[in-house]
């Protein structure tokens, strides 16, 4: 992902606000609510019967944090996202059989939830930078698909 110096600064500044704990679970929860067919990958997570159950589900929140921790690692390696996410791409392709379109959908949810949490600090320029990164991460996660 090619980012300008300004974009890299915006990413680092906003990521430094420590919203990852809240944002990951909320983004994953919203994905599961808005795109209910994605729930099939999480049948071991317990009650996914309603929006309320999804948004308060401890396993959804924990997995969302895990996703954001991986995303955070990607922010450290923007020049090698495919290498950074290679093993996760293989896992999601070969073992979990996740439709790679779901990565793009989750990235969009992440941007929306960050905008909600960060308010006016999430400027249009910051949004554009995050859109570039989530698109790059989605592409990297889809890399091992045949």
UniProtKB/Swiss-Prot annotation:
The modification N6-acetyllysine is found at residues 59, 82, 144. The modification N-acetylvaline is found at residue 1. It holds the Pfam family Globin. One of its GO terms (cellular component) is hemoglobin complex. Signal peptide: none annotated. Residues 2-146 form the Globin domain. It comes from the Eukaryota. Keywords: Acetylation, Heme, Iron, Metal-binding, Oxygen transport, Phosphoprotein, S-nitrosylation, Transport. One of its GO terms (biological process) is hydrogen peroxide catabolic process. Red blood cells. One of its GO terms (molecular function) is heme binding. Belongs to the globin family. Heterotetramer of two alpha chains and two beta chains. This is Hemoglobin subunit beta. The lineage of its organism: Eukaryota, Metazoa, Chordata, Craniata, Vertebrata.
């Amino acid at each position: 992902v090619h980012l300008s110096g300004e974009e890299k600064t915006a990413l680092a500044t906003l990521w430094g606000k420590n919203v990852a704990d809240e944002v990951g679970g909320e983004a994953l929860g919203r994905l599961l609510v808005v795109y209910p067919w994605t729930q099939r990958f999480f049948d071991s997570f317990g009650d996914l019967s309603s929006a309320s159950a999804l948004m308060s589900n401890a396993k959804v929140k924990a997995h969302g944090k895990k996703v954001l921790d991986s995303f955070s690692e990607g922010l450290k390696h923007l020049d090698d996202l495919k290498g950074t996410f290679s093993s996760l791409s293989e896992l999601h392709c070969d073992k979990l059989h996740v439709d790679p379109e779901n990565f793009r959908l989750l990235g969009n949810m992440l941007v929306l939830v960050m905008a909600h949490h960060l308010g006016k600090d999430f400027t249009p320029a910051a949004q554009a930078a995050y859109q570039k990164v989530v698109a790059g991460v989605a592409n990297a996660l889809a890399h091992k698909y045949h």
